[in-house]
Amino acid sequence: MCKYLHMERDSRKIIKRLLSEGWEQVSARGSHHKFRRDEVSLIVPHPKRDLPIGTARSIARAAGWL
């Protein structure tokens, strides 16, 4: 079974988790929200219910969830 099947893909829930873990939203331009913590930054497309699995995986890796 693929370990990515149960990965969160809803941008609203991803953003909520990032903010609860201390990430700071530094900008939002159009549908892309940029977050930063320490020296790491990442971009989350929002609003989007079903992010592509590759995008969700990339966000999870940058956030340290994988």
Regions found by a protein language model. Name each.
Residues M1-M7:
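Short, intrinsically disordered or compositionally biased N-terminal tails of bacterial proteins
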Residues E21, Q25-V40:
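Major-groove DNA-recognition helix of helix-turn-helix-type DNA-binding domains
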Residues D10-G22:
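Amphipathic alpha-helical segments
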Residues D38-L66:
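C-terminal structural segments of small proteins and small subunits
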